[in-house]
């Protein structure tokens, strides 16, 4: 019985000390991750502090960038992210242009 209580106590203490991805705070509908500093290949999101707090940034990993709209993502000023920002702006312009071409056109009732 004593060994059972000792084992339970050890597991309860270890559960408090585990530093893994068990309690990672997510942002942007579980697309981004709250971190102190984003990696160069990750995208930094505008107003991420509202979801992650003032001391952390909301970072969108490179493999999940397609799941989040381009116009809400802002990059930090590094050489790699400047190219990404230019690509994102171009993609946004193309998306806006294609959406404006999808506007409904009036049809005359006679024909």
UniProtKB/Swiss-Prot annotation:
User: Where does the signal sequence lie?
Assistant: 1-20
Q: Which GO terms describe its cellular component?
A: extracellular region
PTM remark? O-glycosylated; glycans contain alpha(2,3)-linked sialic acids.
The region called In vitro binds to LPS, mediates antimicrobial activity and inhibits LPS-mediated inflammation is annotated at: 21-63
**Which cysteines form disulfides?**
27-58, 34-52, 38-59
Where does it live in the cell? Secreted
Q: Name one GO biological process term.
A: antimicrobial humoral immune response mediated by antimicrobial peptide
Signal in keyword set: yes
Found, by tissue, as follows: High-level and epididymis-specific expression. Expression is down-regulated in infertile men.
Domain of life where this protein originates: Eukaryota
According to the record's subunit comment, the protein's assembly and interactions are: Homodimer or homooligomer; disulfide-linked.
Q: Which family does it belong to?
A: Belongs to the beta-defensin family.
Which disease does its entry mention?
Answer: May be involved in infertility. Homozygosity for frameshift truncating mutations are associated with reduced sperm O-linked glycan content, impaired sperm mobility and a reduced live birth rate. However, for one common mutation the change in sperm sialic acid levels has been challenged.
Q: What does it do?
A: Highly glycosylated atypical beta-defensin involved in several aspects of sperm function. Facilitates sperm transport in the female reproductive tract and contributes to sperm protection against immunodetection; both functions are probably implicating the negative surface charge provided by its O-linked oligosaccharides in the sperm glycocalyx. Involved in binding of sperm to oviductal epithelial cells to form a sperm reservoir until ovulation.
| Designated name of the protein | Beta-defensin 126
Organism, per UniProt? Answer: Homo sapiens (Human)
Identify the taxonomic lineage of the organism of origin: Eukaryota, Metazoa, Chordata, Craniata, Vertebrata
